[in-house]
Amino acid sequence: MKGIYSALMVPYNEDGSINEKGLREIIRYNIDKMKVDGLYVGGSTGENFMISTEEKKRVFEIAIDEAKDSVNLIAQVGSINLNEAVELGKYVTKLGYKCLSAVTPFYYKFDFSEIKDYYETIVRETGNYMIIYSIPFLTGVNMSLSQFGELFENEKIIGVKFTAGDFYLLERVRKAFPDKLIFAGFDEMLLPATVLGVDGAIGSTYNINGIRAKQIFELAKNSKIDEALKIQHTTNDLIEGILSNGLYQTIKEILKLEGVDAGYCRKPMKKISQKQIEFAKELHKKFLKN
């Protein structure tokens, strides 16, 4: 399960419905053009927390139908509604997903015993493997080394998507749990995360920049740090431009420039403006056009 995973982007029609044809095109682009090792389905990049349970199920259905066995798939089923998380976990397990992920429960200030019960309930009810999704800058949930250790005592909890800038904690987790999977979650810090020993990475920009991400990862693993750093610099120039212009809107616009029907973002996200479109064209021409 190691390697570079795109956090799968989901295209929506102007009325907010899922653009199913476009979703299949994005999946194919990731597999055929970006050459990613896997897809992380149902995460933030898919605007997952703004869609219904039935819509989430449809995304999971399309992803596994289109990808089949060509890449690894991880299904993010997390929700502050534990019943929904379990329902989705059971559903995707029946579909054939071999591993789940779940964001730490957020909004309410859950204590660690509640967070632990949340993960153990999903694992127990589904019988599937679990990757913790730790993204404290959005959830407000910061877990300690000892808390990761408590969760990892469950043999079904096999790793973490580590989307945090605390690289001291990342190093400690890596040293303490050499047999657990660690995926870096910040695309702009892939190189230092790889040096610290992550097993792979999951990111939104890999939908359009997956080839560079794979280069950084492989070069760093082979101690070719100077070469990897040059590519990370270029990657971060691209990411800086994307973030300044609207993350999801810009990635979707760049996908359109690549001939992919990437649709629109789901409200309340804004529709992309003409000014944003023009800047996306500049980024595409400078960083991605062959």
UniProtKB/Swiss-Prot annotation:
Matching PROSITE patterns: DHDPS_1, DHDPS_2
Coiled-coil ranges (or none): none
Pathway(s) of this molecule: Amino-sugar metabolism; N-acetylneuraminate degradation; D-fructose 6-phosphate from N-acetylneuraminate: step 1/5
KW Lyase (keyword) present: yes
EC numbers on record: 4.1.3.3
Keyword Kinase: no
GO MF annotation terms: N-acetylneuraminate lyase activity
Cell compartment(s), UniProt: Cytoplasm
Enzymatic reactions: aceneuramate = aldehydo-N-acetyl-D-mannosamine + pyruvate
Main location group: cytoplasm
Family recorded in the similarity comment: Belongs to the DapA family. NanA subfamily.
NCBIfam families in the cross-refs: nanA (TIGR00683), PRK04147.1 (NF003164)
UniProt function note: Catalyzes the reversible aldol cleavage of N-acetylneuraminic acid (sialic acid; Neu5Ac) to form pyruvate and N-acetylmannosamine (ManNAc) via a Schiff base intermediate.
Record-given protein name: N-acetylneuraminate lyase
Organism: Fusobacterium nucleatum subsp. nucleatum (strain ATCC 25586 / DSM 15643 / BCRC 10681 / CIP 101130 / JCM 8532 / KCTC 2640 / LMG 13131 / VPI 4355)
Source taxonomy: Bacteria, Fusobacteriati, Fusobacteriota, Fusobacteriia, Fusobacteriales
